[in-house]
């Protein structure tokens, strides 16, 4: 019997790489993407591209409008996206309250319905500035919840939360993506929803730095490439 897994596919580099890792592990993937009122909704087009590239046949787009109450620069247009660089001492305003908990809960529901063995997550605790729901402790706690709150869990068959990149640096993620043939240029990481990535938000800065260090400057944002060309 083919083993199945759910992949949370945002359209970003991390989730695309995680999807490729899951496929390499022999899973038939079911992808979940979310329109949650994010200003960078452009990532959903990237998610579709990645799903098509990886030949993922079942791809669900779920509407969960977290912008109704805002609380984050990603879901509230009145809050500016920080562009002054990363401050590791604070939880940034780009943190979306409860987002991963909502997403993983829906993934757990789908996993039970499809009898999937695993839920693959592209979360990363190393290069991000303090998101509380991107930590190994959070994953462990949610696994306990899945074990206790589901029929599959009570039968000893709860879907396992797998986050293969959680302790990888972004440079390591870039290298894994390249080794797996992930089309990095088709992924979207920028917090803005413009035609081109801004090159200034935390996500762009982290990605650009990693691409440069890994030896792929041609994949960096136009802003960085232009500045290096001067």
Curated annotation (Swiss-Prot):
GO terms for molecular function: ATP binding; ligase activity, forming carbon-nitrogen bonds; zinc ion binding. One of its GO terms (biological process) is queuosine biosynthetic process. Catalyzes the ATP-dependent conversion of 7-carboxy-7-deazaguanine (CDG) to 7-cyano-7-deazaguanine (preQ(0)). Belongs to the QueC family. It holds the Pfam family QueC. Binds 1 zinc ion per subunit. The lineage of its organism: Bacteria, Bacillati, Cyanobacteriota, Cyanophyceae, Oscillatoriophycideae. Pathway: Purine metabolism; 7-cyano-7-deazaguanine biosynthesis. It comes from the Bacteria. This is 7-cyano-7-deazaguanine synthase. Keywords: ATP-binding, Ligase, Metal-binding, Nucleotide-binding, Queuosine biosynthesis, Zinc. Zn(2+) binds at residues 190, 198, 201, 204. Its EC number is 6.3.4.20. It comes from Microcystis aeruginosa (strain NIES-843 / IAM M-2473). It catalyses: 7-carboxy-7-deazaguanine + NH4(+) + ATP = 7-cyano-7-deazaguanine + ADP + phosphate + H2O + H(+). CDD domains: QueC-like. Transmembrane segments: none annotated. ATP binds at residues 9-19. SUPFAM superfamilies: Adenine nucleotide alpha hydrolases-like. Its cofactor is Zn(2+). InterPro entries: QueC, Rossmann-like_a/b/a_fold. It is an enzyme of class 6 (ligase).
């Amino acid at each position: 019997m083919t083993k199945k897994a759910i992949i949370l596919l945002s359209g970003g580099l991390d989730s695309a790489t995680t999807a490729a890792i899951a496929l390499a592990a022999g899973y038939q993937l079911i992808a979940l993407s979310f329109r949650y009122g994010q200003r960078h909704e452009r990532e959903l087009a990237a998610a579709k591209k990645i799903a098509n590239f990886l030949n993922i046949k079942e791809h669900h787009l779920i509407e969960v409008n977290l912008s109704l109450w805002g609380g984050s620069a990603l879901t509230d247009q009145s809050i500016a996206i920080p562009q002054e660089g990363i401050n590791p001492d604070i939880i940034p305003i780009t943190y979306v309250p409860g987002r991963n908990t909502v997403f993983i809960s829906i993934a757990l529901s789908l996993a039970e319905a499809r009898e999937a063995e695993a839920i693959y997550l592209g979360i990363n605790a190393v290069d991000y500035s303090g998101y509380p729901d991107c930590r190994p402790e959070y994953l462990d706690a949610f696994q306990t919840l899945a074990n206790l709150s589901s029929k599959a869990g009570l039968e000893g068959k709860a879907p396992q939360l797998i986050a293969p990149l959680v302790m990888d640096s972004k440079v390591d993620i870039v290298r894994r993506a390249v080794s797996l043939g992930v089309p990095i240029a088709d992924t979207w990481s920028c917090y803005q929803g413009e035609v081109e990535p801004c090159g200034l938000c935390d996500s762009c800065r982290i990605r650009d730095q990693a691409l440069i260090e890994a030896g792929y400057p041609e994949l960096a944002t136009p802003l960085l490439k232009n500045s290096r060309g001067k």
